[in-house]
Amino acid sequence: MPATVKKTGSKKSKRNVPNGVVHIQSTFNNTIVSITDTSGHVISWSSAGASGFKGARKGTPFAAQTAAEAAARRALDQGMRQIEVLVRGPGAGRETAIRALQVAGLEITLIRDVTPLPHNGCRRPKRRRV
């Protein structure tokens, strides 16, 4: 009986994807950056929590910058050069994440705010009294 060869390492091959879309979801508690190709397949992602921040520090602009840099680094390894940025949510890390993508060497062709706005849908949660 032949010995089975165990494969180690990443299964993802290095693809050459020149254009892509960056989805930045920025809430008050966290910032998630997903980089996809034009058809929507995720190439790289990162979040403030995945970058090593915990608790309230995940909602800071610096955590969003770190997450965007990490995702951009992996996208650049795949050969990405031009991106469109779709920003969702009201969080503190929106602008900082976009700036970090620019500094990382990605050329931004479009910035669009895709925050969902209800046309009077569900009832809002009651106001916090602190």
From Swiss-Prot:
Enumerate the UniProt keywords alphabetically.
Answer: Ribonucleoprotein, Ribosomal protein, RNA-binding, rRNA-binding
Query: This protein's superkingdom?
Result: Bacteria
On subunit structure and binding partners, the annotation says: Part of the 30S ribosomal subunit. Interacts with proteins S7 and S18. Binds to IF-3.
Cellular component GO terms held in the UniProt record: ribonucleoprotein complex; ribosome
Which Gene3D superfamilies does this entry report, sorted A to Z?
Answer: Ribosomal protein S11
Query: What gene is this protein translated from?
Result: rpsK
Q: Which HAMAP family match?
A: Ribosomal_uS11
- Coiled-coil ranges from the UniProt annotation: none
- What family classification does the UniProt entry report for this protein? Belongs to the universal ribosomal protein uS11 family.
Protein name per its UniProtKB record:
Small ribosomal subunit protein uS11
